[in-house]
Amino acid sequence: MATRQSKTAKRNKTQNQKRNVESEVFTDSAARNLLENQPKLTPKSKVKKPSKLAVKKQQAKVRLYGAKNGREYKESELQIPVLNKAVVPGVKAKKGKKGKVFVDDNDNLTMERLVKSINDKYDKVNESKLEKSRRLEEIREVKRREMEKKEEQKKNKLDDKKKELKNKASVARANRRKNAKEAAKEAESDEPRKKKVSFA
């Protein structure tokens, strides 16, 4: 059985209503006409909002299988504006792909190593342990020869530089000696010569 309300409660219920603020667009016809003529300032979103059912399905999948990791973007893709850097005068930064090493055409060792290592990665061959160890040994041998070749090249380069420096030093020494001789000759020529008399 419902409880009876007092008269004051009934009065309060009817009197204390919320004020409704109506926009003049609905009451004033002129304002409504002005609003109709306004261009649509905000363009419609091209992305369609998923329905409630689709959202529920997606959430159920997330609960079952876990959320997919979103794609990670690189800094270059995000188009972040580059802050002002200190520019070193006279130094030009290299452009182009970094870490790109070109192999010489006549560098057979590097080519051989690359071919063998690529085959090692991508050839799914059922081979015995002996064959596999032999193949790995070949790759190691090629790498070792390549390292030896690089060391030899370094040594040759260093020797060439030493020779060049020695040659420069010897040329400079020869020039200094030549200049000293010329200076001595000039000094002798500047002094007054004494007359010499020879008796027969």
From Swiss-Prot:
Residues 121-191 form a coiled coil. It is found in: Nucleus, Nucleolus. GO terms for biological process: intracellular mRNA localization; mRNA transport; ribosomal large subunit biogenesis. Residues 43-58 have a biased composition (Basic residues). Residues 143-167, 180-193 have a biased composition (Basic and acidic residues). The keyword Transport applies. Keywords: Coiled coil, mRNA transport, Nucleus, Ribosome biogenesis, Transport. Residues 1-58, 143-200 are annotated as: Disordered. GO terms for molecular function: mRNA binding. The keyword Ligase does not apply. InterPro entries: Loc1. One of its GO terms (cellular component) is nucleolus. Belongs to the LOC1 family. Component of the 66S pre-ribosomal particle. Required for efficient assembly and nuclear export of the 60S ribosomal subunit. This is 60S ribosomal subunit assembly/export protein LOC1. It comes from Meyerozyma guilliermondii (strain ATCC 6260 / CBS 566 / DSM 6381 / JCM 1539 / NBRC 10279 / NRRL Y-324). The lineage of its organism: Eukaryota, Fungi, Dikarya, Ascomycota, Saccharomycotina.
